[in-house]
Amino acid sequence: MRELVAYAAQYHVQVVPEIEMPGHEVAAIHVFPKLTCGEKQVPIRTTCGVSDNLLCPGSEFTYEFLGNVFRELADIFPSPYIHLGGDEAGHPALDCWTNCDNCKALKKRLGITTTDRSENWRLQQYLFDRMIDTLRTKYGKTPMFWYETDFKKIQSGCVTFSWRHGLTKQALEAAVANNAKIMLCPGEHCYLDYPMAAGDMPEINWGMPVISLKQSYELDPSWGMGKDFEKNNLFGVAGTLWSECINSPERIYYQAYPRAL
């Protein structure tokens, strides 16, 4: 990883590491079953998608593990940013925390009494708050994460990513309300792994929507929210290109350009 960081720096590229939490963690959970609720033995995923096996916010082992990971990342990556993930945490979201004994004990300790599953988002808030504090106080890093509409409170100074197709306006309004910065990468304009034309699907796909060159270029970075939003909240614009359906470097370039220009 150090070689990659050094190589990128030669071309004035800053590499920002992302460690997903609490979802998209099956590889780590497979090796360390103590990371998930019930300490389940979880097989490695061989296909893309969303897993219901999440990091357990009620287990101190989770925080020990993440602390070790972030310590190593902070040493390897000079970037002032570290991405915490936060998206696609199960179907329904965070559901495996509902009946977990460790999670129940944490809810009791935090005084959480609701039982409509909103309590699980408060556990996610607790998990993120602890990790955000670690990144800021120990390593001087600015936390980033994917915005989900049920994640109501965003710590000031964090950078959220607006990505979900059709929910960009809500994400931007949440950033303004929480005095947070936001990276604009809406699925309807900026997902470069989506095909540019009907019938031009990658060999492996899940029925992706089409994002034409015209759609990409029609992106309004301020999303109609005006100059104050651009000045105070807009962090930037990102094109996302996930490799789960990409089987060659040539396909990466084909998908990225000219839409990324």
Which residue stretches match the model-derived regions?
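Flexible, acidic glycine-rich loops studded with aromatic residues
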Residues: 143-261
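Substrate-binding cleft of carbohydrate-active enzyme catalytic domains
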Residues: 1-141
